[in-house]
Amino acid sequence: MKRGRIKVTLYNRTLKEIDMSDFSYISEDIFSNRSDVVKIELPEGVKKIGNNAFENCNNLEEVIFPDSLEEIGQEAFINCVNLKSAVYKKGVKVDPTSFKGCIQLET
């Protein structure tokens, strides 16, 4: 499968498992307002996280970014109030609003 943009529509179903092995771009708003997301581990190959991609995921606690990541969009994780860990490599372009409202963010 060729790497490219993939967008998933979930229609308010409970999120159990998502295979993102062929994602290179996480679309805008793709997982916004998901209270069932607790941990995200993005696979190698993901280069960009779109604006508001994980906005208001209020139970999200941890994000693991791949070394391939180059950019985190505007408000990508805004108001993820339980997010405690989000570690990315030096040189990643991070919008100043990417983690706005993440009041428990330690790293």
Positions of the model-derived regions?
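Structural signature of tandem-repeat unit edges
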Residues: M1-K2, V8-Y25, S35-K48, N58-E71, ...
